[in-house]
UniProtKB/Swiss-Prot annotation:
Encoding gene (name): argS
Protein name: Arginine--tRNA ligase
Lineage start: Bacteria, Bacillati, Bacillota, Bacilli, Lactobacillales
SUPFAM superfamilies for this protein: Anticodon-binding domain of a subclass of class I aminoacyl-tRNA synthetases, Arginyl-tRNA synthetase (ArgRS), N-terminal 'additional' domain, Nucleotidylyl transferase
Species this chain originates from: Streptococcus pyogenes serotype M18 (strain MGAS8232)
EC top class named in words: ligase
Record carries keyword Cell membrane: no
Main location: cytoplasm
EC identifiers of the protein: 6.1.1.19
Length: 563
């Protein structure tokens, strides 16, 4: 039990007027540590008990069982709790040393599935930094959900269908060179895609031609299908090479095309429930009762189905296949209206499990303040960016530790980790400006800074030749150790908050705080001095490294033992 919960439970025993959760939320951290570790304001009880807050605080402080604390005192209208630091540090260190990387493992999920729709790049387009956010946020959430006891199912809902394939076929037939595409598939396909879009702005016949080729593709035309399959296969080879570099895996690559034969059922269900309404020749579902002004456009006047129809089919398929406890869509914030409509249509169809679906939205990545766009050729490609990050990491490692063994593997972990961490430390609803130099810096709130703190601790433990014993009692009571102990003790709550809010930045900020607290401790403490506290200090180092490594793992970032 963490200290806040302990205090709330002890207060609840003498204050039946308030629920324990309400007490928990009222607890404050005094600005001055001389006033205690946590304080409960008695103002909230003044009306109920019809007494002055000072009197309430004084009376309750007398009734609270002090055996769990160093002391409990009333100061004005507050009850101030001074924690038994030696006792709590002993408990926390024992828990981490005993559990190792399983420390803070929780069982909320009880093995139930969480479907995570993530990454989902478009076939025949390069994997850009714009796709990175969905990939790394989704991957981190998968680790977090597993830590909460769920079974994550990572789905790469590939953009492998749509009018853009009509455009690409037109471009390839006009200017394509098979040998060039085979040699550099994505580069060549991108050039064709950008060129055809530029021409389409002045030549309206291109759009019609593209629509015609896409209609052929929908009808199973041999030439169209073979070209589509070729574009898809070449793109996937390139994507998988990048996913390997990022250490990201998937459980399903069912993309948009997978649902082509599953949309008729959606239309039949909507018709059977009398939900389809005709509007200007199109078929729509009205959603005004859900506060959604625009109806969901299900089928256009020319009979073509739309993106939402496909997503309805995907939602039904995933519920039947995975029976998910949660279904998460890690997709940019610009799709917010679409996902509101999707959930509302499913609700109208009578599927209450739509309440278990969440759009995990995120802000844009910009470069020099400008929005990125594949169509306009203004794009930061991930592959060369990862290579440059690894090179920058390698240069810094060479300068700091030229004799390091396995430099290439460490540079890869630091370079890739830097890009991921920088993305994840940003509140997901906020965008960020892409700055590789800032990402790979060993100073500031960065991945390499946290990784370096972990590597530094491993170096200390190697020098001391120290491995903690699960049967030894370790404890510390000094102020700087206490700051670290409090953070380590808070780790289970941080995991739950990250999970509840679908917000990996909570975990990233925790990792930064823990690394900063340890570095402060390291600067002010002679850890290896041979005195009676040495093993206690080393046990704290061991616990800190264990939690730092696990926090980084939950972000999808490796923690090298040497840097």
């Amino acid at each position: 039990m963490d200290t806040k919960t302990l205090i709330a439970s002890e207060i609840a025993k003498v204050v039946p007027e308030l629920e324990q959760d309400a007490i928990f939320n009222l607890l404050e951290t005094p600005k001055n540590s001389d006033m205690g570790d946590l304080a409960f304001p008695a103002f909230s009880l003044a009306k109920v008990l019809r007494k002055a807050p000072q009197m309430i605080a004084s009376e309750l402080a007398e009734q609270i069982d002090e055996s769990q604390f160093e002391k409990v005192v009333a100061v004005g209208p507050y009850i101030n709790f001074f924690l038994d630091k030696a006792k709590i540090s002993s408990q926390v260190l024992e828990q981490v040393i005993t559990a190792g990387s399983d420390y803070a493992q929780q069982d909320e999920g009880q093995g139930r599935n969480v479907a995570i729709d993530m990454s989902s790049p478009n076939i025949a387009k390069p994997f850009s930094i714009g796709h990175l956010r969905s990939t790394v946020i989704g991957d981190s959430l998968a680790h977090i959900f597993a830590k909460m006891g769920y079974q994550p199912v990572k789905i790469n809902h590939l953009g492998d269908w749509g009018k853009q394939f009509g455009m690409l076929i037109v471009a390839y037939k006009k200017w394509g060179d098979e040998a060039a595409v085979q040699a550099h598939p994505i580069d060549e396909l991108l050039k064709l895609y950008v060129r055809i879009n530029a021409e389409a702005e002045t030549d309206p016949t291109i759009d019609e031609e593209a629509r015609e080729w896409f209609r052929k593709l929908e009808d199973g035309d041999k030439e169209a299908t073979e070209l589509w399959q070729w574009f898809r296969d070449e793109s996937l080879l390139e994507f998988n090479r990048l996913y390997d570099q990022l250490h990201v895996t998937f459980d399903s690559y069912n993309g948009e095309a997978f649902y082509n034969d599953k949309m008729d059922e959606v239309l039949d269900l909507l018709e059977a429930k009398n939900l389809l309404v005709e509007s200007k020749g199109a078929q729509v579902v009205n959603l005004e009762k859900y506060g959604i002004e625009h109806p969901a456009l299900i089928k256009k006047s020319d009979g073509a189905t739309l993106y939402i129809t496909r997503d309805l089919a995907a939602a039904l398929y995933r519920k039947r296949t995975y029976d998910f406890a949660k279904s998460v869509y890690v997709v940019g914030n610009e799709q917010a209206a679409h996902f509101k409509q999707l959930k509302a249509v499913l609700k109208e169809m009578g599927y209450d499990w739509s309440d278990d679906m969440t759009h995990v939205a995120f802000g844009l990545v910009t470069k020099g303040g400008a929005k990125l766009s594949t169509r306009k050729g203004n794009v930061i490609l991930l592959e060369p960016t990862v290579a440059e990050a690894i090179n920058r990491a390698a240069s810094q490692i060479e300068a700091k530790n030229p004799n390091l063994a396995d430099k290439e593997a460490v540079a890869h972990a630091v370079g890739v980790g830097a890009i991921k961490f920088y993305d994840l430390k940003t509140d997901r609803m906020n965008g960020y400006d892409f700055d590789l130099e800032a990402m790979v810096s060993f100073e500031g709130e960065t991945g390499p800074y946290v990784q370096y703190a972990h590597a530094r601790i491993q170096s200390i433990l190697r020098k001391a030749d120290f491995t903690p014993s699960a049967t030894t009692t370790y404890s510390l009571a000094d102020a700087e150790s206490w700051e670290i102990i409090k953070l380590i003790q808070d780790f289970p709550r941080i995991i739950k908050r990250t999970s509840d809010n679908f917000e990996p930045s909570i975990m990233a900020k925790f990792a930064i705080n823990l690394a900063q607290s340890f570095n402060k401790y390291y600067a002010h403490t002679r850890i290896l001095d041979d005195n009676s506290e040495r093993d206690n200090r080393l046990a704290l180092c061991y616990a800190t490294a264990t939690v730092l490594k696990e926090a980084l793992r939950l972000l999808g970032v490796d923690a090298p033992n040497e840097m």
